[in-house]
Amino acid sequence: MVNKSPRELFKVPAAWSITQIMAGLTKALDGTGPALAFGPSNFTQVDPEIAIVMPTSGSTGVPKEVALTAPALLASATAAHKYLQAEPGQHWSLLLPTNHIAGVNVLVRALSLGTQIVESNFDFTSIVPTQLYRALHHDAKLLDSLKKAEAVLVGGAAISLDLLDEARSAAINVVTTYGMTEMCGGCIYNNEPLGGVEVQVRSEGRIALRGPMQAREYLGVNGPLADEENWFITNDAGYLAGEKLFVIGRTDDQIISGGEKISLETLDSHLNSEYDVEFMSCAIPSPEWGQSLCLAATNYFNIEEIKEKIRRKFGNPAVPKFFLENVELPRTSLGKPDRQKLANKFEMMYP
């Protein structure tokens, strides 16, 4: 008889070492220990099939709790290793936090290769564009390690073509990745779907994905994670050229800066409720951050005060990089924020 009793959900302590996390993750995957929550959770139990619970990345939006099964996590690792032609005994290095799926994926991949995480002389690692930029411009030690690696996965945010060219010119074998927590992280490598991954681009340009690494559900959310044909409908827009997927941006008001999602509408609403000045945010391309957050207002304001208020409320990733004061905020004919027109103004001011 199949055991359908709930499984304990254990919140991974911040003080745990990588060795402790790996031990707990091993038991979560093979079913001999509790499921693990890699972030704040409102739950203490989950269905027995669930191995880990991950918060969706986000500093201004409300994170959802994504429930992932062991078969999904292992399918993701297997597909990644097949693409990378990885072999048992090769090593991964962890350069990302474990409260993001990309960090946990590194641990799962190491376990599937039968090795421990190493800090140097690694074969593979996963980073965000900001880390790659800093390696090329500031961090000689990291740069040396990346150049020696067989492959360096870069995802979590859009990477500029200039940064990609610079990295490859420096002899770093960059593999660009696209995915999300709901698909166990990256499932598109160098614009190509990993094994078992299916891609659609709907009529409105919205990307839809499905595959064996798909998440089971959002905890505490009524309704399915996917549609009736098990397609996960993303908030990203893109197009297909043959078998390759090209992502061109978001369909909502979110941006990704330094690997963190930021809701522009949430940020604006908070500031506009706190001040008599009207604020509007937007983003411009950045080789270091992927996208740099910008903030404009209809009057003058204390920039340092605003930065500190945003930092306390939403965290460091949501602090704007550029400011414009006492300007007219552009709007569409329907009265909605025209963020693209505002971004054009910032690009002229901060080329």
Q: What residue ranges belong to the model's regions?
A:
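Conserved C-terminal "lid"/linker of ANL adenylate-forming enzymes
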Residues: C282, C294-A296, E308-P351
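Gly/Ser/Thr-rich phosphate-binding loop
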Residues: H138-N190
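Conserved pre-ATP/AMP-binding loop-to-beta segment of ANL
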Residues: F38-P55, P88-Q90
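Conserved AMP-binding A3 loop
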Residues: I50-T78, Q85
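Conserved ATP/PPi-binding loop(s) of AMP-dependent carboxylate-activating enzymes
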Residues: P193, R202-N230, R250, E260-I262
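AMP-binding/adenylate-forming
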Residues: A67-A75, H91-K141
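AMP-binding/adenylate-forming catalytic core of the ANL superfamily
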Residues: G211, N235-A318
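Conserved ATP-dependent adenylate/AMP-binding module captured primarily in the ANL superfamily
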Residues: M1-G39, L74-S93, L113-D123
